[in-house]
Amino acid sequence: MPSYTLYYFNGRGRAEICRMLFAVASVQYQDKRIELAEWTQFKTKMPCHMLPILEIDTETQVPQSMAISRYLAREFGFYGKNNMDMFKVDCLCDSLFELFNDYMAVYNEKDAAKKTELQKRFQNTCLRVLPYMEKTLEANKGGAGWFIGDQILLCDMMTHAALENPIQENANLLKEYPKLAALRTRVAAHPKIAAYIKKRNNTAF
């Protein structure tokens, strides 16, 4: 088993899905959290000058959160059993990441007028993405389990990670999508994920 170090800011953000994968796989890693005040000195040392970064065996450093999460999901067995499964996982994760990115744009915007426009975009993205996800989940055993097959996969965990802050801000976000809401509850109740959530750093994002 290689050694892993995950570099990110002291928050959940784009790295939380990676941390959840380490937790559910029971794989040890170094969780290196960089404070914003330290970022300037670290920035030029990081590939693409961005976070998160996954370092493998102190030799290979790779950026891009979704590339990292997909790599870890493949390595740990949470990416499906065949190419069609993986295709579906990618589709669901990309849809959630689009929603997550739109929410982050709202979260980070300081200008009130721009924030209002970005909020409309986020709401439109929700109206496109969430019905599709609800229908996709329901197609697998009525939506009572996971998105694909009988095992929790990357896309299930992504449903929890990507929607955490949006739901904290709007508790009714999934009111019209009861299957998705129940899925998030199942993910959070997974013994290894529940243990991780209980002990993780308490951060705003």
From Swiss-Prot:
One protein family per Pfam: GST_C_3
Q: In which tissues is it expressed?
A: Lens.
Q: Does the keyword Phosphoprotein apply?
A: no
On whether Metal-binding is a keyword of this UniProt record, the answer is no
Domain GST C-terminal, which positions? 82-205
Superkingdom of the source species: Eukaryota
Q: Which residues form the GST N-terminal domain?
A: 2-80
**Disulfide cross-links:** none
Q: Which PROSITE patterns match?
A: GST_CTER, GST_NTER
Q: Name any one GO molecular function.
A: structural constituent of eye lens
Q: Which SUPFAM superfamilies match?
A: GST C-terminal domain-like (SSF47616), Thioredoxin-like (SSF52833)
The alphabetical list of record keywords is: Eye lens protein
A biological process (GO) annotation for this entry? glutathione metabolic process
The protein's role, per its UniProt record: S-crystallins are structural components of squids and octopi eye lens. Contains relatively little if any GST activity.
Q: What PANTHER family does this protein map onto? A: GLUTATHIONE S-TRANSFERASE
The family classification in the record reads: Belongs to the GST superfamily.
- What is this protein called in UniProt? S-crystallin SL11
Taxonomically, what lineage is the organism?
Eukaryota, Metazoa, Spiralia, Lophotrochozoa, Mollusca
